[in-house]
Amino acid sequence: MPTIQQLIRHGRSMKASKTASPALEKCPQKRGVCTRVYTTTPKKPNSALRKVARVRLSNKIEVTAYIPGEGHNLQEHSIVLIRGGRVKDLPGVRYHIVRGSLDTSGVADRKQSRSKYGAKQPKAGAAKK
């Protein structure tokens, strides 16, 4: 425990908080180019083939980003927009690709939570039975 004299000389230092998405460099989103699009398996209790892409960002940093939603049109050299947000059961995946922006299409036939997946509002005639 410091003495009062030591506190007068040095003061208390604030602990610097670490960002969860350092590659974004304090930006809300960043643009990048897909270098590889592939599937990977999640951690122990879960089982699936999760779609991910290796993305080279405009600041030359290469990251792994998750492709949300069912089906996608991404391939190598697709230009994508990424945002922060990790995937809990995929180690090393700390970013999400934004659906419906740049080369990424929105999720087809999405009825709920459409804004999160870049899906347009369905036509009024199609919704009625």
Swiss-Prot record:
This is Small ribosomal subunit protein uS12. The modification 3-methylthioaspartic acid is found at residue 89. Keywords: Methylation, Ribonucleoprotein, Ribosomal protein, RNA-binding, rRNA-binding, tRNA-binding. Residues 116-129 have a biased composition (Low complexity). With S4 and S5 plays an important role in translational accuracy. Interacts with and stabilizes bases of the 16S rRNA that are involved in tRNA selection in the A site and with the mRNA backbone. Located at the interface of the 30S and 50S subunits, it traverses the body of the 30S subunit contacting proteins on the other side and probably holding the rRNA structure together. The combined cluster of proteins S8, S12 and S17 appears to hold together the shoulder and platform of the 30S subunit. It comes from Chlorobaculum parvum (strain DSM 263 / NCIMB 8327). Part of the 30S ribosomal subunit. Contacts proteins S8 and S17. May interact with IF1 in the 30S initiation complex. HAMAP family: Ribosomal_uS12_B (MF_00403_B). Residues 101-129 are annotated as: Disordered. Pfam families: Ribosom_S12_S23 (PF00164). SUPFAM superfamilies: Nucleic acid-binding proteins. It comes from the Bacteria. GO terms for cellular component: small ribosomal subunit.
